From Swiss-Prot:
This is 4-hydroxy-3-methylbut-2-enyl diphosphate reductase. It comes from Mannheimia succiniciproducens (strain KCTC 0769BP / MBEL55E). Pfam families: LYTB. It is an enzyme of class 1 (oxidoreductase). Its EC number is 1.17.7.4.
């Protein structure tokens, strides 16, 4: 029995940056540091930061006046930013720059009064933050999750429309929705390149390659991680059993019955240490060799805010 490792896998530049912001804020300012929402969707990472003094909250009313608060990698609405300002909170923004790029598209549409359609998953914090960039009562922003939702929009074919997408979606599903949007609204405008981020795209492509060579695919990632769920769904769609696990403790020996090749990958918010523990556990269960796909190299780096950078360099 052998393992094939996906490449790339695990942390992306936005996650790296977000975790660094919390770590550096704790180092410079000391605990407690408040973080609005889980800074990234990974239980292991969040628990580690909590042990060091990060306090995770869902709303700013849980943060004392004048305290330090970090916005998670998923981004926040304009209303949350304004509330932080009104409360005199010291903010470090860990919003992924690729999410911020989508925020700017929405804000531009809002200023022009152009109606916007966001392709994304209802209730996901990134979607909440992105929709919260639109504040023009003359226009409006509408959420669609799938092709069926487009029929319910009730917008006129001839009105000025623009669309954007959540950054962690399935490339295939999103492509289908965009095709349907353009068919219903031929004049609709959108980004020159889709908003799905490079890391999501690369990890989905790696899982395609992995699934072609595997009898079982294991995705390391938390259940609330959008991009991790999409990786497991993609493998399943290709006809390969897929398991989404938080860590090696979730592995059930029965999964390996009749299996020769196990593909292993990790979502963009899952650290490599978890992948290595999964490999160790699978070796205990009979794996005798580990290979790695060649994949593509990722060199993207996002800098932390300058107030934290001085300490990092020093």
């Amino acid at each position: 029995m052998k393992i094939i490792l996906a490449n790339p896998r695990g942390f992306c530049a936005g996650v790296d940056r977000a975790i660094s912001i919390v770590e550096l804020a704790l180092e410079i300012h000391g605990a407690p540091i408040y973080v609005r929402h889980e800074v990234v969707h990974n239980r292991f990472v969040v628990n580690g930061l909590r042990e060091r003094g990060a306090v995770f909250v869902e709303e700013l009313n849980e943060v004392p006046d004048g305290a330090i608060v970090i916005f998670s990698a998923h981004g926040v609405s304009q209303a949350v930013r304004q509330e932080a300002k009104n409360r005199n909170l010291k903010v470090f923004d860990a919003t992924c720059p690729l999410v911020t790029k989508v925020h700017m598209q929405v804000a531009r549409a809002s200023r022009k009064g152009t109606k916007a359609i966001l392709i994304g998953h209802e209730g996901h914090p990134e979607v909440q933050g992105t929709m919260g960039q639109y504040d023009n009562p003359e226009g409006g922003i509408f959420l669609v999750e799938n092709v069926e939702d487009i029929a319910k929009l009730g917008l006129k074919d001839n009105e000025e429309l623009t669309f954007m997408t959540q950054t962690t979606l399935s490339i295939d599903d999103t492509s289908d929705v965009i095709v349907a949007l353009k068919a219903k609204y031929p004049a609709i405008q959108g980004p020159r390149k889709n908003d799905i981020c490079y890391a999501t795209t690369n990890r989905q492509q790696a899982v395609r390659e992995l699934a072609e060579q595997s009898d079982l695919v294991i995705v390391v990632g938390s259940k609330n991680s959008s991009n991790s769920n999409r990786l497991a769904e993609l493998a399943s769609r290709m006809g390969v059993p897929a398991k989404l696990i938080d860590d090696s403790n979730d592995i059930e020996p029965d999964w390996l019955k009749g299996i020769n090749t196990i593909g292993v990958t990790a979502g963009a918010s899952a650290p490599e240490v978890l992948v290595q523990s999964v490999i160790a556990r699978l070796k205990e269960l009979g794996v005798d060799s580990v290979e790695e796909l060649e994949g593509c190299e990722e060199n993207t780096v996002f800098e932390v805010p300058k107030e934290l950078r001085i300490k990092e360099v020093g």
